[in-house]
C-alpha cells in the first residue's frame, strides 16, 4: 500500500471509529476465505461491515476518536466489525464466534466506552434497535386497544340486556 492509499485508509477508518454505534475487535487467525466471506455477508445483512487493517494503521486511525481506549486490543491478526446499530455488530460477531473457534472476540467499543470480551457478549444479548422499536409500538398500541374495548363495552352490554328481554318475551 502506498503512502497516499494509507492516508485515505486511515481517514476512512477514522470516520468509522467516530461515526459508528459499536466496534468489535477480534482475532481471525485460522479463518478460511469462505468463513471470512460468510462473516462479512452476515454482517452486511445486519447493516454492519468487517474490515481487516494493519494494527499500526488502526491505532493511528483511533487517535482523537471516542473509541481511542481500545488501542491495546490491536495485536496479532485482528479484524474490525462495526455497525451503526450498537447491538448488530456484537450480536453477529458473537454468534459467529460461537460456531467458529478461530474467531476470538478481544473487545470493542460503544461510543466512548471501551468493552472487554464479556462486555461485547453482554451487548450482543440485548435486543436490537428494530426489536426495541417493535416493543415500543406494541406498548403504545395496547392502551388504544383497551380504550376501544372500554368504550364499546357499554353498548355491547346494552345489546345483551335488550336481547335477554327479547328472549324472555318470546318464551312467555
Swiss-Prot record:
SUPFAM superfamilies to which the protein is assigned, alphabetical: Ribosomal protein L10-like
Keywords associated with the record: Ribonucleoprotein, Ribosomal protein, RNA-binding, rRNA-binding
UniProt GO cellular component terms: ribonucleoprotein complex; ribosome
Single annotated GO MF: large ribosomal subunit rRNA binding
Highest taxon in the source lineage: Bacteria
Matches recorded under Pfam families: Ribosomal_L10
An individual GO BP term: translation
Task performed by this protein: Forms part of the ribosomal stalk, playing a central role in the interaction of the ribosome with GTP-bound translation factors.
Sequence similarity: Belongs to the universal ribosomal protein uL10 family.
Subunit structure: Part of the ribosomal stalk of the 50S ribosomal subunit. The N-terminus interacts with L11 and the large rRNA to form the base of the stalk. The C-terminus forms an elongated spine to which L12 dimers bind in a sequential fashion forming a multimeric L10(L12)X complex.
Official protein name in the record: Large ribosomal subunit protein uL10
Organism whose genome encodes this protein: Chelativorans sp. (strain BNC1)
Amino acid at each position: 500500500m502506498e503512502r497516499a492509499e494509507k492516508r485515505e485508509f486511515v481517514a476512512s477508518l477514522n470516520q468509522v471509529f467516530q461515526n459508528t454505534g459499536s466496534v468489535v475487535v477480534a482475532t481471525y487467525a485460522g479463518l478460511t476465505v469462505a468463513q471470512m466471506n460468510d462473516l462479512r455477508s452476515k454482517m452486511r445483512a445486519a447493516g454492519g461491515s468487517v474490515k481487516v487493517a494493519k494494527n499500526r494503521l488502526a491505532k493511528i486511525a483511533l487517535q482523537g476518536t471516542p473509541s481511542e481506549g481500545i488501542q491495546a486490543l490491536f495485536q496479532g491478526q485482528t479484524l474490525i466489525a462495526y455497525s451503526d446499530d450498537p447491538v448488530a455488530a456484537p450480536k453477529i460477531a458473537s454468534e459467529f464466534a460461537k460456531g467458529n473457534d478461530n474467531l476470538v472476540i478481544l473487545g470493542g467499543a460503544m461510543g466512548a466506552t471501551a468493552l472487554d470480551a464479556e462486555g461485547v457478549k453482554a451487548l450482543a444479548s440485548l435486543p436490537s434497535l428494530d426489536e426495541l422499536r417493535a416493543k415500543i409500538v406494541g406498548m403504545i398500541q395496547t392502551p388504544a386497544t383497551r380504550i376501544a374495548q372500554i368504550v364499546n363495552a357499554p353498548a355491547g352490554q346494552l345489546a345483551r340486556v335488550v336481547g335477554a328481554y327479547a328472549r324472555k318475551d318470546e318464551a312467555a
